[in-house]
Amino acid sequence: MSDTILGKQGIDPRVVQLATQFKADQGPELQQMQSWLSQWGQPTLSMTPGVEMPGMLPDQDIAALKNAQGVDASKRFLTGMIECHEGTIAMAEDEIKDGQYPPAVALAHSISTREQQENTTMQGILASL
């Protein structure tokens, strides 16, 4: 979703800044989690169409974002990212509660805290558009 919004013109600068930040934050986290899975002999994460995870947006919402412009695109991005973050927070909270590998639990704490803060920021921006 970040790549989609970053490829558009007329997007609120606060939204562009968030999308850029999301890409910077999530890349290393995903690499770390995939590295752990690989070390443990487990399959790595996949973004296979049709495979659902908490917070994943339906294809029609992604298509609507791709077709949207300006303020509408900004609103769709923020709404979708809030939903995505809520799913990520739920998964992180599960890891915090049940996780057994301390580095993964620590990463889950970091992700949960950051994404809760980001949701507050996104809700504020959304209310101002």
Question: What would you call each of these model-derived segments?
Answer:
Residues M1-L129:
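All-alpha RGS (Regulator of G-protein Signaling) helical domain and cognate RGS-like helical scaffolds
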